[in-house]
Amino acid sequence: METLLHAKLLLSAEVESLKSGSFDQTYVKKAEHIISGESYQLVQQFVDKFKGKISISGEISTSSVIAALNDFLNVEVFKMGQENEMLFLAIALLQTFIQNNYTGPAARLKAISGLFGKTGIEIGAVNTALSRSLAIMGQPAYEFMDDPLYLVLSLLLLERITGQKSLFDVTPDQEIPLPIISAESTPGLLAVAYWWWARALLTQLSLIPEPSGFQASVASAIYQSADLAYAITKELPESIHEDFKRELCAMYYLENVKCSLAINTEHLCLPSLTRAKKITNFEFVMTGARATRTKYQQKAHAGLIILAKSFTFQNFALRTTSATPETFALESDLLLEKPHFESIADEPLDEQIYSKRQKVDLNEGYEEDKLLPLALRQENIPKLLLDLNPNDQPTLSDYDNIQLLLRLYTIKNTTPAKDPLVEEELTALLSRILYQNGDKNWSIFARSLWERSIIETTKAKTIERGLLQMQSLVEELDLKIKSKLVPSSSEINVASRLSYIHQLPFIPRWQLDATLAEKYMSLGILKSAVEIYERLGMACETALCYAAVGDEKKAEEILLQRINENDSDARAYSILGDIKQDPSLWEKSWEIGKYVNAKNSLAKYYFNPPPKSGAQPNYSATLKHLNDSLRQYPLSFETWYFYGCVGLQCGKMQIAAEAFTRCVSLDPYHALSWSNLSAAYTKMDKLKEAYSCLKRAISCDAQKNWKIWENYMLVAVKLNEWEDVLTACKQLVSIRRDKSGEGSIDLPIIEKLVELLVTSEYPEEPQQLSYFQKSCTEFICNTLPQVITTSARCWRLVARVELWRKRPWAALECHEKAYRAISHNPDLEVEEKVWNDTVDACEDLVAAYESLGEMEGKYGPGSLVCKDWKYKCRSTIKALMSKGKGRWDDSPGWDRLVEARSQI
């Protein structure tokens, strides 16, 4: 029953459901406190029980404080056989830390003074040491967080419960074993502990500016497989409803996505989002509908809308009713509060999405396996959604709202910033969450308001509302701000704020304030931005603020002051190195904290040294620094990609192959990585491997990348995969024809395809044609003529295929076009080579008239291909001689024309 109780705690289940089971009521009471947002009561009991029990030997420092905590836990707290008790304590500590730093309002406890028995200045020193203990790879955690003791204790307890090596004792040069979780062999309670440990590690990662270190690797390993959830569900009583297990699995996939977003592996999000969507039976689609956006708009115009409906609602999660965050009306003289959509079924055919998208295959009108399933036409909208009122859609379940938010974050992390179309998609997602009736969860609603405000602050007509909303949301977390726009409310439901905090990406309260400062900075309000950064104690961000406006001297002063105050801040050294372009500062950053960005900066410096340095590119040094960086943080896709590109450039194909192999394992859908991996294999004479990589590349989103298709074509030629060569040729022409015209045609390859095509006899019945013959004929005879403009060589190839098809009239027409293409060359009268080429074309055309003219024509027996072919021969020769008369009379080409005329 312990596993069931903890499963309910993971889900933040209804408190009443705990009382109905045959649970140990002592643990039920603890679970009630945690689920109801009263974790601080368990923490207070813990502090009261062990008051003054932690003693620090010697000077107060990070190492001495961690050593004291370890001794305290080993002697006083952690007892074998009491893992369940310790797990509740670890959860309560984590939840209290999150409440104090992420959701608010803070629970003011005096834990440090109680446990350590310290007062005055010593409390501040212990708090600073605890904050610094949460640093990762030279990146200090935010120093002014509240109660870091709670998170440190929670992490230490969870490490003991799971039996894993403590990450507080690991040096950057060491290697640690990653957790392995099995659905069959891992006990359910241990799986629960792993789950909470991953949550705590993601909390720690959110305290630093950039994800790195062992914490990211361990969290990723825990969330790697759904065995984490299955290890728990296998131990649940048979009487437990299947819906409960489904909710647990759905929550796992949501947190898996959150983890991927947190450690910058967002390309892994889509499979988990797809599984979560299936488990919750969530139906949604993005499509187009006509809408009015202004008060005086007479005609509605097409826009994007998310149609969504929940078919499964959480039956076990805590249902909370609380005041939603303060919202601000737009109060615009022009814009409506929200777009008013007309009926989906009334969308005119010429205003549907596909009419605005070029080259869309209308047979694929519904794209489901995307971050945003897309219906290009009305008939492609799922029937379950087609009847929805776009202005009054039904309430979504909390899990489905979270899915939309997670898809929004994934899109933001994988698309260019400030892209108008992307912003329209994000706005459609947020509108679906915000504009729905029914109860709203505080955290979900507040996060949606925050993301909407970030978009609105980029637009002139909505910037005022956006800034006010951001300021209001910052204040609602109960920050220590002297003057507030919104009065504090005493009716705050902490449980509502905490219920989905582990499924939504973490945003600490100071990060909200820092984002507000970034907005001020983007608007040129430097003073307000600097004031916020200084209030938050973010020296590095303040320096970057000044550097962004060109005041690098001031930025250097701030960073030097920061280094004097905390000489272990590797990030400050690295940023100072970025500003001064000084390799010694990056080396210092790496020396004191193994800060991976310092090594990345060194690699970029030696790859492309600044002109004033006088240095030459040093690829060996670049590879060395990148290798050091990747040893510390092997989850960085960008670093692996750069590593591979450098390997390609300096001819080290083994390194390039290794790097791009890691890239495609991190992001299996990155077409350029597959293409570059194939390039490395090609150089290593591993053509089959290169061919397989290119097949993966073109199966990814590479429809517009002609270089990938060209590489695919060339490797396929070497392997004699002629059907794939043909496919690549067709795709190359399709992609490049608008910009390059007939330059998109690879003539040597086309000639080889034609040679292969005409070696066999043309069958009597068209149905007997093979796939290659049909496809190649269609390409040569239908596609190429639309592209050819001046290439006589191309027209001759088309003529050859037409003759093979037993269409001599079409072949003769191609010969005529070939001659016209070259005879209209303006250089005909000045360059003898052009003159001779034209004479060759004329002779070819005359020969074609002679050989094809008397064949059976297009209209069957009795008709000829060209009845007056002799006349056309003479006319063609005469016309060319008139162009060359007076300039090429004495040339060999002229003599050939005279001879040809005499032989007719």
From Swiss-Prot:
Localization per record: Cytoplasm; Nucleus
Coiled-coil annotated spans: none
Main location: cytoplasm
GO cellular component, one term: nucleus
Domain of life: Eukaryota
Keyword GTP-binding: no
TPR repeat segments: 510-544, 563-596, 603-636, 637-670, 671-704, 706-739
Its biological purpose: Required for the maintenance of the cell wall integrity.
UniProt cross-references to PANTHER family, sorted A to Z: TETRATRICOPEPTIDE REPEAT PROTEIN 27
The name this protein goes by in its record: Essential for maintenance of the cell wall protein 1
Organism: Saccharomyces cerevisiae (strain ATCC 204508 / S288c)
